[in-house]
């Protein structure tokens, strides 16, 4: 019997296609060179530290602030090195305001260490209560893979926390606040389908805080509109567009300015 391979998707793929189908095609199908940006290693390094902080806390062996900062330094240097190996000319990196690639790497190293410090301070006031899954796993960087009517959806949930006795999905953000709650809605559904519990009704983004700004979660989003049917419909909408090779560009000045595949885009050129 022939086994049919199901398409494998993620929230980031859905968001990228919705934002600009041409960018999706260039990055995911054509696999063109992608322009690096210093905020990428900053984000991944912070996420690695935040995960480690919560994991070691759950073991009763909390990390010290100095250990967490050293961990950030290692991850940041490692990720910057990988990007630099592929794109050694910093002038080809994405600028952040007046900062070119090299200056932004230096700046975000400092910003990232400050964010680690702020995360530590926030956790002590009193921070967050991490949910423990039915199988005894702390809900930190939870992997999931669910099927939505013939489409496999997978990803990682930064944290599932307990607020006033109820579950809430949480995603850490080191940059700007997202403009929608679709990502959180998918995470809530994934928690329900994976662990057989009621889907969390709310979710939030933990804004780590840009330089000089205090960290805090956003106001909770009401996720009850993101039913399994609504989320499935969204994934299938994008899947149908990909299958039909519908990759029309959706150019806008702000989007194109920060698009990491714009140098290969026929419209941008």
Swiss-Prot record:
This is Gene 69 protein. It comes from Mycobacterium phage D29 (Mycobacteriophage D29). InterPro entries: PDDEXK-like_dom_sf (IPR011604), PDDEXK_AddAB-type (IPR038726), Restrct_endonuc-II-like (IPR011335). The lineage of its organism: Viruses, Duplodnaviria, Heunggongvirae, Uroviricota, Caudoviricetes. It comes from the Viruses.
